[in-house]
Amino acid sequence: MKIIGLIGGIGSGKTTVAQLFVDEGFPLVD
């Protein structure tokens, strides 16, 4: 199992990238 973290400032696209992962079936913990 791999854990991937998304970091970045406000407006850097974290939510967009997270949604792409969810759309591909990856679990998301916010």
From Swiss-Prot:
It is found in: Cytoplasm. Its EC number is 2.7.1.24. Its main location: cytoplasm. It catalyses: 3'-dephospho-CoA + ATP = ADP + CoA + H(+). InterPro entries: Depp_CoAkinase, P-loop_NTPase. Pathway: Cofactor biosynthesis; coenzyme A biosynthesis; CoA from (R)-pantothenate: step 5/5. One of its GO terms (biological process) is coenzyme A biosynthetic process. PROSITE patterns: DPCK. Keywords: ATP-binding, Coenzyme A biosynthesis, Cytoplasm, Kinase, Nucleotide-binding, Transferase. Residues 3-30 form the DPCK domain. It holds the Pfam family CoaE. GO terms for molecular function: ATP binding; dephospho-CoA kinase activity. GO terms for cellular component: cytoplasm. It comes from the Bacteria. Transmembrane segments: none annotated. ATP binds at G11, S12, G13, K14, T15, T16. It is an enzyme of class 2 (transferase). The keyword Magnesium does not apply. Belongs to the CoaE family. Catalyzes the phosphorylation of the 3'-hydroxyl group of dephosphocoenzyme A to form coenzyme A. This is Dephospho-CoA kinase. It comes from Corynebacterium ammoniagenes.
